[in-house]
């Protein structure tokens, strides 16, 4: 079943994500912002990814370069190459639905990986650069 959710306060996100089986990250190939500064895709921090990892759930995401720092295809996420095609997403969801062992392994991998990308660990990296 698909559930579309209204705004959720940030503090409630982990609880909401925990109720889901598969988490989607349907990014587009380029991101622009007001002020005509151009494509900021290379500089975007995928905060949603860190939230998803922390609850140890299955992730299906667009083939988006900035995600590949953390995402290893088929190890902790499914990358949809033809992400503009809704049927590609549907196909990946259905494939995962019938592979409980793969779901278990990917979930476990994501939770372990989340420790590397926790707020505390990311803050340590930023402080190293600043000092």
Name what the model sees in each region:
Residues 10-13, 86, 103, 115-126:
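Amphipathic alpha-helical segment in the mid-to-C-terminal domain
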Residues 1-22, 31-33:
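Nucleotide-activated donor-binding/catalytic signature segment of Leloir-type glycosyltransferases, i.e.
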Residues 92-98, 119-131:
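C-terminal alpha-helical cap of glycosyltransferases
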Residues 95, 101-116:
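A short, well-ordered alpha-helix in the C-terminal region of glycosyltransferases
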Residues 23-25, 51-54, 58-61, 66:
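Short hydrophobic beta-strand element within catalytic cores of glycosyltransferases
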Residues 25-27, 45, 62-63, 69, ...:
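Conserved acidic donor-binding loop of glycosyltransferase catalytic domains
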Residues 25-41:
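Short Ser/Thr-rich beta->loop micro-motif in glycosyltransferases that lines
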């Amino acid at each position: 079943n698909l559930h579309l959710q209204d705004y959720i306060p940030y503090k409630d996100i982990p609880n909401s994500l925990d109720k889901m089986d598969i988490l989607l990250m349907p990014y587009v190939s380029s991101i622009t912002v007001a002020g005509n500064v151009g494509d900021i895709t290379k500089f975007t921090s995928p905060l949603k990814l860190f939230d998803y990892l922390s609850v140890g759930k299955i992730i299906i995401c667009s083939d988006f370069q900035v995600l590949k720092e953390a995402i290893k295809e088929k190890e902790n996420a499914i990358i949809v190459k033809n992400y503009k095609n809704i049927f590609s997403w549907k196909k990946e969801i259905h494939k995962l639905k019938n592979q409980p062992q793969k779901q278990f392994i990917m979930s476990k991998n994501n939770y372990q990986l989340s420790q590397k990308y926790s707020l505390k660990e990311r803050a340590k990296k930023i402080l190293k650069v600043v000092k």
